[in-house]
Amino acid sequence: MKLPEKKYIASFDIDAQNTFTPICPNELPVVEGDQIADELNAQAKFASLRIASRDAHTNEALWLSDETNPPLSPIEGHPNLDIRWPAHAIIGTKGFDFIPGLDPAAYDFQVYKGIEVDKHPYGACYHDLGNKLSTGVIEYLRCNGITTVICGGLATDYCVKNTVLQLRNAGFEVILNKAACRGIAPETIASAMAEMEAAGVKFIENASELEEN
């Protein structure tokens, strides 16, 4: 795939954290989630800026599941919470850390999301579910003249999909590197891919398909 000039390109590593891998089996493990670092690093070579998002939660979060309120059970009365989840990506734990092979110092901009106890966003562009409270990443990309964003991360069918759609709605061209993503379930991955394709997202199988201008 022919790319625009490098100065117009950013590479986005979405929630590539241990919490979404078998490294943390009691959190939200995604099969092979710890095997995408090489592809994320490869796609970053085609970009002038490298950005990342990370879930950054606390043990006081109102969406935490327990024996009375199991995972995926609905939450009422909180506009920025939809369902319950097991504890994951708690700040200061192994789950919060990047997956092996990613260097925190390699990034130009990072988003920490879900810090507030009453918010559990999926996309990395907004802190709320209504896409109103900006994380600043859209503005950062615009200020730096970025027009195209190459994306990968975890998980395809949740945070990756939502972030990609937010970027498209903000007017960016988006390329999703399939080899730099892993998802939770075949049916939800397929649905996410269809939704992203309908929004105009372009797909590559891996970073070797990218071609510099």
Q: For each of these PLM feature ranges, what is it?
A:
Residues 1-115, 143, 147, 169-176, ...:
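Active-site acidic carboxylates
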Residues 63-64, 126-130, 157-158:
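Short acidic/polar alpha-helix capping motifs at helix-coil junctions
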Residues 87-92, 126-131, 153:
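Short, surface-exposed loop/turn motifs that are enriched in glycine and acidic residues
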Residues 104-144:
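Histidine/lysine/aspartate-rich catalytic loop segments that bind and position anionic ligands
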Residues 120, 158-162, 183-186, 212:
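Short active-site-adjacent structural elements
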Residues 146-162, 176-181:
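Glycine-rich anion-binding loop/nest that anchors nucleotide
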Residues 164, 168:
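Gly/Ala-rich phosphate-binding loop of Rossmann-like dinucleotide-binding domains
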